[in-house]
Amino acid sequence: MKLFEIENAVDCRIIGRVNRFVVDVEVDGRRERAYINNTGRLKELIFEGNVGKCLTKRGGKLSYRLFAVSCEGGYALIDTQLQMRAFEVAIPKISWLDGEVRRNVKVGNSIIDYRIGESYVELKSAALKKGIYAMYPDCPTARGRKHLRLLEEIGKRSRALVVFVAALPSVRAFMPNREGDEELYRLIKRSKNVEFRSIQVEYLNGKVFLRNPDLKVVI
């Protein structure tokens, strides 16, 4: 199912990651710096010589925003803002979610991504691919641990979910990555009050598609 189109994408070649938010790319023979909206390490995707897709960025010091990179004959949609947009557009097709959608919901001193009906939902980017599995995280994440502990408390009185967005081609299931964060892996395994769900989306030929609204989750 097509979710939306991404117009005016620019081809690029990756030179290397500069820091958490910046990657050097080559566009039309020119060396440029592009913003990257994903705090994962993405070492399997962001490496010299790999090709990607950028959008022209308005404002700020950087001219481009890297949103997708080549992955096993297709593209990984790495931009978390676009992943969130894909999730929101896909909600009517997701049978296990229903109700009014509210974004950035305050719970105590923290913010949860969504409240959908009576469900509290936190989105996570599963951008690591190992075989048939999309995985999260690819590096230690204190933020991820904090969110899961919060959802565990919320889940005692309401429905609480973590939804992993597998924005990768040719995956058949999601699995938490023990090597990325051992403590988070243990928290997921021990969780009693949180549902773990996953959807698969894919960027192809200028469009973002919903490939699976209920991707298998292996805990």
UniProtKB/Swiss-Prot annotation:
The gene is sfsA. CDD domains: SfsA-like_archaeal. Pfam families: SfsA (PF03749), SfsA_N (PF17746). InterPro entries: SfsA, SfsA_C, SfsA_N. Gene3D superfamilies: 2.40.50.580, 3.40.1350.60. Belongs to the SfsA family. This is Sugar fermentation stimulation protein homolog. GO terms for molecular function: DNA binding. It comes from the Archaea.
